[in-house]
């Protein structure tokens, strides 16, 4: 299940928990648009600033934050990829296609990918990666995968 608003799509599980947020390359807004809720470990904001505007120099103060779990941000620089979304109990929810310029925040649940075209992709997440403790791999049922092969852009 998904909910879209102005080229921002929230992927929801069957209990309306947010599994992911996709910001399509065509998304636009005025000024600063904070897209994620305040309780997320990663904050995503869209900014539209005019030429010549000055953003005052600043530092980020060390603030203690407690994070449980891992949230990933993926930015697709080129190509296309299918993302399969799962609930935390590994129940398949839905799939979506991402293309060049799309950004996705994976907030909870599970996910898998199939590369549809050669991709260049950047991944951002809390680190460092805890090898052997950070993820549990599983084999989905291929017949469950449902998606439309429409170009996202």
Where are these regions (language model features)?
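Glycine- and acidic-residue-biased ligand/ion/polar-headgroup-sensing regions
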Residues: 50-51, 69-84
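Short beta-strand His + acidic residue motifs that chelate non-heme Fe in jelly-roll/DSBH
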Residues: 57, 83-84, 104-106, 111-116, ...
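Short acidic-glycine-tyrosine-enriched beta hairpin
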Residues: 87-108
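A short, N-terminal "cap"/entry segment at the start of jelly-roll beta-barrel domains
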Residues: 1-47, 141, 149-153
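Conserved short histidine dyad/triad with adjacent acidic residue
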Residues: 29, 47-68
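Short, surface-exposed beta-strand-loop junctions and turns on beta-sheet-rich folds
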Residues: 63-64, 89-91, 120, 128-130
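Double-stranded beta-helix
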Residues: 112-153
């Amino acid at each position: 299940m998904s909910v879209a608003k102005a080229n921002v799509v929230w992927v929801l599980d069957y209990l309306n928990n947010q599994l992911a947020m996709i910001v399509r390359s065509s998304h636009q807004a005025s000024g600063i648009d904070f897209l994620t809720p305040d309780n997320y470990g990663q904050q995503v904001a869209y900014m539209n600033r005019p030429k010549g505007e000055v953003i005052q120099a600043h530092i980020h103060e060390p603030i203690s934050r407690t994070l449980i779990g891992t949230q990933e941000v993926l930015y697709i620089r080129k190509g296309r990829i299918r993302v399969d979304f799962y609930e935390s109990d590994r129940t398949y929810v839905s799939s979506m296609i991402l293309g060049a310029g799309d950004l996705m925040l994976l907030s909870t649940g599970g996910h898998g990918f199939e590369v549809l075209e050669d991709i260049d992709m950047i991944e951002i997440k809390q680190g460092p990666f805890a090898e052997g403790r950070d993820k549990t791999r599983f084999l989905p049922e291929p017949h469950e995968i449902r998606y439309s092969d429409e170009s996202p852009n």
